């Protein structure tokens, strides 16, 4: 297994960025790819530092790409960085240029925790032609479904606008617009003691009301790395089964 740290210039952000890539030990590729997103205030290295993701994929024919998403929520800000374009154009472009990565939908998936859970769902719903599966662990899935208040961090208004409900940043609205035949396979999980549990329950209920197939789990636990380290293993199984 190889571990690569890649520094590159992101045309979408207009600045340097980085990603960490885990490559399988054997085979020549092209390899299926999981794009794995971090949470708010973390970076490209956090999954390696706080979980055993490298160990969990040791026997899988799977590349794992962990990009730096900053605090940008993996969306193109109303007034600011084009973080969606950064992932879809720069990160994916560099991955496919530098590594033997699969380039077809059937062998690409995306997942993330917290902010990254929102990002995984948002990117998969904006680009269903690019991902066969998307998974959210403890995702902030309702962040675009509510008014942005003064109690929230100041960059939220810059990213989402003052009232993003109903916009393309609202997952509840966005999923209604996606062609059902093009929807990726969806996974949502959250700890029962997580402060985001009610948002996840609401999104799950919304998907059920629309008749949209998805996997939903509530597990013991909170918004912690112990929780994510345990349940990323199930997400990996879900992703591999979706890829076939």
Question: Where are the model-predicted features located?
Answer:
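Non-catalytic cap/lid and distal C-terminal segments of serine-dependent acyl enzymes
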Residues: 1-244
